[in-house]
Swiss-Prot record:
Name of the protein: Peptide Hp1035
GO CC annotation terms, alphabetical: extracellular region; membrane; other organism cell membrane
Keywords linked to the UniProt accession: Amidation, Antimicrobial, Cleavage on pair of basic residues, Membrane, Secreted, Signal, Target cell membrane, Target membrane
Tissue expression profile of the protein: Expressed by the venom gland.
Extra information: Negative results: does not show antiviral activity.
Function: Amphipathic peptide with antimicrobial activity.
Modified-residue entries (Phenylalanine amide), positions: F36
Similarity section: Belongs to the non-disulfide-bridged peptide (NDBP) superfamily. Short antimicrobial peptide (group 4) family.
Source species, domain of life: Eukaryota
């Protein structure tokens, strides 16, 4: 019974490793395909993420954080 349980656990771990590595490899392949595709290098714009970050904190943000911390 112990041997069967150990074999089951090892099989589950190996299956999980295979499933996760497949997802990682497909994501890397899609990324490389998008970069080295026909228009991939022309459309490469790394500044798109700058719009998501606002480095300035307004007074309203500080007041809101103070209310949260009370």
């Amino acid at each position: 019974m112990k041997t069967q349980f150990v074999i089951l656990l090892v099989a589950l771990v190996l299956f999980q490793m295979f499933a996760q590595s497949e997802a990682i490899f497909s994501a890397i392949g899609g990324f490389l395909k998008s970069i080295f595709g026909k228009r991939g290098l022309q459309d490469l714009d790394m500044d798109d993420l700058d719009q998501l970050f606002d480095g300035e904190i307004s007074q309203a943000d500080i007041n809101f954080l103070n209310q949260l911390m009370r």
